[in-house]
Amino acid sequence: MLSPKRTRFRKQHRGRMKGKSYRGNCICFGRYALQALEPTWITARQIEAGRRAMTRYARRGGKIWVRIFPDKPVTIRPTETRMGSGKGSPEYWVAVVKPGRILYEMGGVSETVARAAISIAASKMPIRSQFLRLEI
C-alpha cells in the first residue's frame, strides 16, 4: 500500500477542500484516464483496490499510471477514550482529491478494454468520476 517513506511532521490538520484542481487535471502519460468530479479524501486502500482491479482486467496488455499519492495522515482516537489527552495516533493515509483531478491513466490498450477497466476502478472510488480520452 502507498504511504510516504518519511514526513516532516507525524500529524496534520484536517484542512478543507475548496475550489477545483488546477494541477494534475490533464492526461500526461497514457491515452485514457479517470477524472474525479467531486472533492474527497481517497485512502491508500481505495487507490490500491482500483489499481489492482485495472491491472487484473487489462491482463498483461497496457500500462497503468496512478496519478495520486496518499500523503496526508489521518489520526483516530481509540474507542471509549475520554476527551482530552491530545490527538490520536496516525491510523491511515489519504490523498486529498479535488474536482478535476486525474486519478488513473492507462495506455497501450484498446478503448473498449480501457473503458471497462477504468469503470471497474471507478466503482471502487467513493466519488463520481468520468472517463477521459486523449484528443489528438
Swiss-Prot record:
Annotated GO CC locations: chloroplast; mitochondrial large ribosomal subunit; plastid
The keyword Ribonucleoprotein is annotated on this UniProt entry: yes
Coiled coil: none
InterPro entries in UniProt: Ribosomal_uL16 (IPR047873), Ribosomal_uL16_bact-type (IPR000114), Ribosomal_uL16_CS (IPR020798), Ribosomal_uL16_dom (IPR016180), Ribosomal_uL16_sf (IPR036920)
Cellular localization per UniProt: Plastid, Chloroplast
Chief subcellular location: plastid
Keywords, alphabetical: Chloroplast, Plastid, Ribonucleoprotein, Ribosomal protein
GO biological process: mitochondrial translation
GO molecular-function terms, A-Z: rRNA binding; structural constituent of ribosome
Subunit record text: Part of the 50S ribosomal subunit.
Name of protein: Large ribosomal subunit protein uL16c
